């Protein structure tokens, strides 16, 4: 029986690469996107052509209601065996003093709150089955940082 994974931020970059690896291993993949619809649909078609079930699911993980709906839609493919949180955005390259409250909240909303909301939504599915894995991913910004002062 095939396994099922939900990958947030899966339309491009690290998320898309992660989706390709899971699909190559035979996993069915739910690809979350927020703005990159065409890229997500193209990736779903690419993965499906390789013999796995792949679906593109729109949702802003920084919104708890959308994160809940996203997990439920992904679970309709089959029991979720894994969640991989790749969704992330970054501040523009600017001085910290030029960063607006809105910019800061948006980044924290996606990069921090989004991880919490999707994990919280998927946990009941995994606890009920007494199995499942959650992986959180960061880009190199999480290691190298940047100068903003």
Regions found by a protein language model. Give the residues of each.
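Conserved NAD(P)H cofactor-binding loop of Rossmann-fold oxidoreductase domains
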Residues: 86-92
